[in-house]
């Protein structure tokens, strides 16, 4: 569903300019900036279970990598087009691991992402918005509970509390896996009705400081 294939050069140039400007702003503030190593995303990828015509990209490391303490965890990812996205960050993770004896590089079990992981025709255009909103309110999402699935961008950390959004890209088995993995943290599953396509908690709310968050009004708390 949706667009795939190369973006236009104009949009790529604009996006790169935005990223470069943001990087330069951080560097001027004394912050070290590392950038991922892109691969050719405009190529067909496959596993023994499926094929995808193209891949996604590597603009948001927040989607793939979850940092908690001295550990960086590679998420399972729930889109087939993002299955190999972790490769863009491996050079940096290798560098961090070699330079810091306390750094832990972990990877969640890679899912097979067979057809059993998705509800057939869930994204059909024939389904109206009211039905979709009812589905999300009932926690009935496009992904099933076939195997643990989660994107790192579905997790927000508040001290020892990890708040995890249950939605399109993270299922309950994925949340349970996180609970077992982060035994020193409290993991809370949350759901935000009001968005028919709930993906990623960082598009739901963002903590600013103690006692203050910014909330997406379409995903009411």
Predicted regions span which residues?
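The feature marks the mature, well-folded catalytic cores of soluble enzymes
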Residues: 1-221
């Amino acid at each position: 569903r949706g667009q795939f294939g190369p973006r236009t050069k104009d949009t790529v140039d604009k996006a790169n300019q935005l990223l470069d400007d943001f990087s330069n702003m951080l560097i001027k503030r004394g912050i070290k900036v590392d950038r991922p190593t892109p691969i050719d995303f405009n190529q067909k990828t496959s596993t023994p279970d499926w094929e995808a015509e193209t891949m996604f990209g590597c603009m948001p490391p927040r989607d793939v990598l979850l940092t908690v303490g001295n550990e960086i965890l590679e998420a399972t990812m729930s889109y087939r087009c993002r299955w190999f996205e972790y490769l863009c960050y491996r050079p940096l993770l290798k560098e961090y691991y070699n330079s810091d004896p306390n750094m832990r590089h972990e990877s969640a079990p890679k899912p097979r992402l067979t057809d059993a992981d998705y509800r057939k025709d869930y994204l059909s255009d024939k389904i109206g918005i009211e039905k979709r909103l009812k589905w999300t309110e009932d926690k009935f999402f496009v992904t099933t509970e076939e195997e643990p699935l989660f994107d790192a961008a579905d997790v927000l950390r508040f001290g020892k509390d990890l708040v995890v959004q249950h939605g399109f890209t993270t299922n309950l088995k994925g949340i349970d896996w996180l609970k077992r993995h982060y035994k020193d943290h409290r993991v809370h599953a949350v759901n935000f009705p009001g968005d028919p396509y709930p993906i990623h908690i960082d598009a739901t709310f963002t903590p600013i400081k103690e006692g203050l968050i910014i909330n997406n009004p379409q995903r009411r708390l």
